[in-house]
Amino acid sequence: MKVYLAGSFAYKDKEKTKTHQRQLEWAAHLLKEKGLDVYLPQKLHIHNAWDYTPAEWGLMVFTHDVIEIDKADVLVMLSWGKENNAGAAWEVGYAFGTGKKVIVVGLTDEVESAMILHGSYAQVKGMIGLEQYDFATMPKTRDLVGEQS
């Protein structure tokens, strides 16, 4: 099973960026230990990126991510509640719109976005929830609290 692992990982705050990147790496490790094929967008390397304008680079990243979501069987999103960025939310919406199952892993006690939760197939709490989730049977768990719709 192919998994696209979404999550916000680029912030002005360098420490927050490092923390989120480490959590995404750990989630990728947990998923790979389950025998899943994981794509982690933060690992994308565009050769000679400095040769491109920001707009050209952005389009290449966007196009590559769309291709990888299309190839995935499921999208797993690490969610930091209100700290989620537009890119991660867009990835969830795109995956939902193309009929992919979306698993949201809540990493805070914050209330989750109603749009993220209603677009998810299943929700689990924390890395332990991700580690315990059975991707063979794909249970429809609802462990997170969302905004009032």
Model-assigned labels for residue ranges:
Residues M1-S149:
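Conserved catalytic or regulatory cores that recognize and/or transform ribose-phosphate-containing ligands
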